[in-house]
Amino acid sequence: MQIDVMVFGGIISILSSVVSFFCQQYWLNWRSNKGEIKIYTKTVYDKVDKVPWGFYETSSETFFIVPLWIEIQNTKSIKQIVRDVNLGLFLEGRLIKKTTQINSFIKKGVTEMYGDNGSYSFLIDANEIGRYDLSFILRKSEIGGKGFDEVKLMYFDLDDNQHAKTLFKINDAWKETKNSIDEDWRRVF
């Protein structure tokens, strides 16, 4: 009888330990995934030409240029991936073309990198903030002269889900403009 009580007590002890372990793991997993990715942007002057975002004409081509600072805040307790940050050009809600991500430029003989050492994909540590200089460009000839009425900031998350939010509304695509830069950060996501 006494052995049966000891065996029964041991089984209860093991079961309660296992249940307690799984409850603790579930709670830790839930807590580490609590939080979000916040993305802020700020339009700035181009590092090479010292011009703000907009449309620019040369003798042979028209360009759409967007120099941008981006700040990514990870409020989760686990690392997060923000992959392939780009600008999408939309016409009446449909994606027409993505811009070209500029990886680097040469200044006084020194190569300076955009993004994360030339990459527009970012690994953000838990409860951290990352700030990056980005630059995007598109030639009018690359889009066949098509117009667009909206520019969206786009990226893929850890699960390969694509996210897109409006950054600018465009009234007259390909008409030369020199827009003002942002005075403060704007939350996009």
Regions found by a protein language model. Give the residues of each.
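Membrane-embedded hydrophobic alpha-helical segments
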Residues: 1-32
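Low-complexity, acidic Ser/Thr/Pro/Gly-rich terminal tails and inter-domain linkers that flank the onset
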Residues: 27-61
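Short, solvent-exposed loop/turn segments enriched in Ser/Thr/Gly
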Residues: 62-69, 131, 149-150
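The feature marks short-to-medium sequence segments in extracytoplasmic or secretory-pathway proteins
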Residues: 77-123
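Solvent-exposed, conformationally flexible loop/turn segments
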Residues: 125-129
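Short, surface-exposed ligand- or partner-binding patches at beta-edge/loop junctions that are enriched
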Residues: 141-159
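Acidic, serine/threonine- and proline-rich intrinsically disordered appendage/tail regions
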Residues: 163-189
